[in-house]
């Protein structure tokens, strides 16, 4: 958040969490970075408020669902009425469950020119890294592709 040229950094970051304590912890970490990037911390659990926040984002923004909603708890942090900024990146970190945020982003992908990223691939990267460490094996790109193909067959159904 501070080493890149100013033109390569976000003009602002908005972080929404249902728990003020988590926001406070994140604020303390960000303060150590001495960044000039403006960060807004919003304590909120109402998806309609998140819809309003979403509508205020600039085109080509990065929108990440790291809430666990759609995986650990039902729902999505935004409602079906929420509109993603044109050309934005919608990144669903969840890899299982109902994946409401992913479904919502996919529904708007064509019309809003969204770049939608599914957390499944990142989940696999994490697990394969653990396998490399625990079993002292190297998983190169070819092995990763083979393991991913097998894992994809076992993936729970959901939006893609």
Feature annotation, model-predicted:
Residues 1, 23-26, 101-105:
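Hydrophobic packing residues within well-ordered alpha-helices of enzyme cores
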Residues 2-12, 35, 108-115:
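Conserved S-adenosyl-L-methionine
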Residues 7-37, 44:
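NAD(P)-binding Rossmann-fold cofactor-contacting core
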Residues 10-12, 59-60, 85-87, 113:
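A general structural motif
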Residues 13-16, 62, 88-95:
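Alpha-helical membrane segments in multi-pass integral membrane proteins
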Residues 15, 19-22, 40-78:
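Rossmann-like NAD(P)-binding element
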Residues 70-146:
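Rossmann-fold NAD(P)-binding glycine/threonine-rich loop
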Residues 141-160:
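A short, charged, Gly/Pro-tolerant segment at domain boundaries
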């Amino acid at each position: 958040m501070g080493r890149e040229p100013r033109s390569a950094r976000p003009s602002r970051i908005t972080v929404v969490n249902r728990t003020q304590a988590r926001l406070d912890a994140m604020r303390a970490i960000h303060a150590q970075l001495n960044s000039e990037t403006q960060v807004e911390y919003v304590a909120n659990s109402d998806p309609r408020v998140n819809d309003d926040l979403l509508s205020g984002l600039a085109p080509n923004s990065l929108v990440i669902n790291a809430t666990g909603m759609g995986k650990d708890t039902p729902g999505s942090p935004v409602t079906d009425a929420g509109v993603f900024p044109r050309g934005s990146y919608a990144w669903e970190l969840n890899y299982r469950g109902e994946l409401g945020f992913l479904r919502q982003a996919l529904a708007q992908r064509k019309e809003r020119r969204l770049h939608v990223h599914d957390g499944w691939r990142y989940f696999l990267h994490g697990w394969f890294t653990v396998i490399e460490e625990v079993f002292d094996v190297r998983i190169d790109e070819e092995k990763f592709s083979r393991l991913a193909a097998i894992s994809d067959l076992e993936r729970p159904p959901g939006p893609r």
